[in-house]
């Protein structure tokens, strides 16, 4: 029986290998992380799609991040015309399958095309169902929901589309009792953050991050999700220890190559998470450092 299980496990790993790119990641990129029980404080940007040949914001890329035992997988969300929430990265700043999501239903958007692997454009409910299945998500990976600021030709479309997407996502998360599995990322500036922060955190009891680099006192109960250049680059106003020492949880994104990974890893024990396009590559570096 043990031999059969080993064969089945080998086949499963082989299937994953066939679907992943050979670039940018170490040779053993598809092996489970750690000793088989741990979770790494690594967040896979849009499921780590740049590392694995799977569509971004897909169920398939979500499962890739789960397999690696990431802390979370990030995805983008938009509100539809029938008051549902799609998981999708808007094309040209505001389109999903060539349609404006706020003026079309889920059915209409799905009818316009599938993802590259044949999956329908997923809803937030689809993602949460995967996370809530203990067989599919045995280590409790979370979902980081990026509330997209929709833009057209470089100009922001009505910010209420983004605010309402955040609130509708909160309602769905609460209805599905998934508050412990979901956290929000709010883009830079105050147009969305100032409106949603307190309601999301206090009323819906869902964690929330702000992506503006500012004084630690300005985050309130939110955590800081900041780009590498903002706190590790030259001539920065604040460094990582300014947030850590002030008790503001900190996650860092745009950590995608050897230089940035090697600079951030020494802070790993004190960070909320490291956000990357190459989660397996980062995890292998963490393992090499004894984490």
Regions found by a protein language model. Name each.
Residues 20-291:
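Phosphate-group recognition and catalysis centered on beta-loop-alpha active-site segments
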